[in-house]
Design a protein with these regions (language model features):
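Alpha-helical transmembrane segments of multi-pass membrane proteins predominantly involved
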Residues: 1-483
């Protein structure tokens, strides 16, 4: 084996180094001792990992072309690493509990293992490597969902996640087998050269799309989402809702545009249907929720629909707008989950929306930060979420212009998405109304979040404001996508 190939996998190599150092630090230190240094160590290692890989590099390959990584994939990996860093920072408050402190090392290693699997997914140029990366991400993620194993809800959520992940992997592997039967190869480049629209390849594409649809929580593959999000530890829910979803969405976009380009009219129709169903059904269900984590679950399903809008463009603008949307979604969504987690830790695990009535009077700063994040998720200017939605709409309209037979349909999908944006503003404002206007006889008491949570919220808030104002962020992504 030529080990020099690992030099072409710098993001994965540095991440494996972070994982190895974390394992050694956990193994060599006493779990009964006070390990306040452990979380800062892991976070500093992640900062170093991001700093090494933040600038796009030239296209590289390894393992006979099964692994390929270009500037666009490198930028997406940096975005995923940033989201992971924020999760690790805000997890410190939750991991300080007696029932989780002794598992702190396991949590970090599971999170880093899922990120490594996602990186392999993003850089895969072969269906086998893609599937291995997907399973590398899914198995540790199932452990994370069931991390609070002594809580009934967490164990139940883990079981549901495992069953759903197993089923979706089976569906996807069946689709891959059909594609192999039709094309005789599993390399993305070679499949793209020989694939034609036939009943066998269309079936393979649909099964493959369905398998990834489960990972992204697209309707009608979303049934596991609300229960798993509700039962998982809140920090894990935040990680699952942004980092995992972002990696799967980017990979689906890249494969559709690269491998299934000769069948563009077939998967475009499939996308239209899934986008409309995801945005509309998720919005209608979100309005009815009383549990804040279930509310955010349906919000994430709706956001997945908006992310998929970018794919309609079928161009480098699609990659650019999708990556930018994922970046903004990471900071906005993790900001909300950081506040929910902090409230849980200080107020007996409450996640009911009614509990936030009068939240502004007792915790004005957290209420203000929650409002900023919700406004960004809703696409209210001048926050970054407005620009991210604008760019995915622009990509979708670009797709409508280039499709000769399906252009009118694309405009219809964009119109439906715009209408649903107004609906989403309504249910995001329900939380704002509860915090600022509604009265409660027993409001949440005033409390101080941990320093780690404050740091995570500071990073997210700066991102929500600055990423929309500073054009160089979008330019950085655009240059990488067009390289």
């Amino acid at each position: 084996m030529n080990y020099s190939q690992f030099l072409n996998m710098i993001p994965e190599a540095t991440l494996m180094a972070v994982l190895l150092i974390t394992f050694i630090a956990d193994f060599c230190s006493s779990k009964s001792a006070d390990r306040k240094w452990f979380n800062p160590l892991v976070c500093l290692l992640m900062v170093a990992h991001i700093a090494i890989n933040i600038f796009p590099t030239e296209a590289t390959s390894a393992f006979g072309g099964m692994y390929t990584s270009g500037p666009a994939a490198g930028v997406l990996k940096t975005v995923l690493a940033l989201g992971t860093l924020i999760v690790l920072i805000q997890a410190k408050e939750w991991l300080s509990r007696k029932d989780t402190a002794f598992k702190e090392g396991e949590f970090y290693m599971l999170v880093l293992s899922t990120l490594l699997g996602m990186n392999m997914m993003v850089s895969a140029n072969h269906f086998l490597l893609f599937f291995l990366g997907l399973e590398m991400a899914s198995v540790p993620m199932a452990c994370l969902v069931a991390f609070d194993k002594y809580r009934h809800n967490s164990a139940e959520a883990g079981a549901k996640f495992i069953l759903t992940a197993t089923f979706s992997s089976g569906v996807m592997s069946y689709g891959i087998s059909l594609l192999y039967a039709a094309c005789g190869t599993l390399y993305f480049d070679d499949v793209a050269k020989v694939i034609t629209a036939s009943p066998l390849t269309i079936a393979g594409m649909v099964f493959f799309f369905s398998g990834l649809g489960f990972k992204i929580s697209l309707v009608p593959f979303h049934f596991w989402t609300a229960d798993s999000y509700q039962g998982a530890p809140t920090t894990v829910t935040g990680y699952l809702s942004v980092v995992s979803k972002g990696a799967a969405a980017f990979t689906l976009c890249a494969i559709l545009m690269k491998v299934f380009q000769p069948m563009v009219e077939y998967w475009t129709v499939l996308l239209y249907i899934v986008i409309v169903l995801s945005i509309t059904i998720a919005n209608l269900f979100a309005i009815r929720q009383s549990d804040l984590k279930r509310f955010m679950a349906f919000s994430s399903i709706s956001q997945a629909g908006y992310i998929m809008l970018a794919v309609i463009g079928n161009s480098t603008l699609s990659i650019t707008s999708l990556t930018y949307y994922v970046l903004i979604y990471v900071v906005a969504n993790l900001s909300v989950f950081a506040i929910i987690s902090s409230v849980e830790e200080h107020n007996g695990g409450t996640v009911q929306m009614d509990s936030y009535n009068g939240f502004y009077k007792t915790n004005p700063r957290l209420a203000f930060l929650m409002t900023l994040a919700l406004f960004s998720l809703g696409g209210i200017p001048p926050f970054a979420g407005m620009f991210s939605k604008f760019f995915v709409f622009m990509a979708a309209v670009h797709g409508a212009d280039i499709h000769t037979t399906l252009g009118a349909w694309a405009y219809g999908v964009v119109f439906i998405a715009l209408v649903n944006t107004v609906i989403s503003l309504y249910y995001y404002l329900l939380i704002v109304k509860a915090m600022f206007i509604k009265h409660s006889d027993s409001p949440l008491p005033t409390f101080q979040s941990a320093c780690s949570t404050k740091l995570a919220l500071a990073i997210c808030t700066v991102g929500i404001v600055a990423f929309g104002i500073c054009s160089f962020v979008f330019d950085w992504i655009s240059v990488a996508a067009n390289a």
